[in-house]
Amino acid sequence: MADYSFVTLWRFRAPLADVWDLIYRSEQWPSWWRGVERVEKIEPGDSEGVGGVQRYTWKSKLPYRLAFRMRLTRVEPMSVIEGEAIGELTGSGRWQLTQDGDATSVRYDWNVSTMKAWMNLLAPVARPLFKWNHDVVMNWGAEGLAKRLGVERLNVEES
């Protein structure tokens, strides 16, 4: 397995509630986030979605797809969404949203291991390419969110 830790920071001139709604409703991501091919509900969760499982299929600039299931483990409305991934990527993801004046800041922490043998084999030399690919997909998300809300994207930072 190859381990990866990514931090993505987005900032939009938009109310927190509007940004939260788009991120929280991940089943709608394919309609505005380029690269998200499909989100399928596998198991329902509680009233906030905790315990629910969805299957995600992603396609990026590189010629491969990644699919994994994500179990929602924590929701603090208008603040935090956390989940555990199992599949071709295994690990955890955490969205954190904060309001700062007329802007909303979004931080996404994605700590995963690749499960595809070819990715693990190539990781020592392809790691920078995989990182670039992740950053491209996250940038598509920021672009799509800003466009869907009709708001200004103030910045995107990836690691």
For each of these PLM feature ranges, what is it?
Residues 84-139, 156-158:
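Beta-strand/loop substructures that line and gate deep hydrophobic ligand-binding cavities in soluble
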Residues 1-46, 158-159:
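Hydrophobic ligand-binding cavity/cleft-lining segments
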Residues 31, 40-92, 105, 139-158:
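Glycine-rich portal/gate segments that line the openings of hydrophobic small-molecule binding cavities
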Residues 13, 75-77, 100:
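Structural motif
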Residues 7-11, 67-69, 92-94, 109:
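Well-ordered beta-strand positions in beta-sheet-rich domains
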